[in-house]
Amino acid sequence: MLTEKQLTIRRQHIGASESPAICGVSPWQTAADIYWRKVSDIADDEPNEAMMTGHRLEKPLIEFACEEFNLAGLRRNQFRVSKDEPLLSATFDALGDGVAVECKYVSAAGAQHWGEPDRKSV
């Protein structure tokens, strides 16, 4: 989970996870939701069960990715701002030399909406 400091900094940028809403393709939030979250004191959503499960699984999933794909020296919970577009940012579950790792948890029912059938990665 992000710290209060990280959450405060994120409010100053458009994050990668917010861009679908801004582009009008998110089924969960709208561009207006993002706008009001940025300009007001609206609190971020309270973590739900899926969010908490995903957070708990991040460390073992990153360890698995390191073993599976022969990755070393990954740094966890990395926040980056675009050099070319300073309004844009992203928070990565892990970063390494030339590689970014992002872990997502979905329920069995939600898994059908991710990736292509019979593929190991998304």
Where are these regions (language model features)?
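Charged, glycine-rich intrinsically disordered N-terminal tails and low-complexity linkers that flank
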Residues: 1-60
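Mg2+/Mn2+-dependent nuclease catalytic core
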Residues: 44, 51-55, 59-62, 66-121
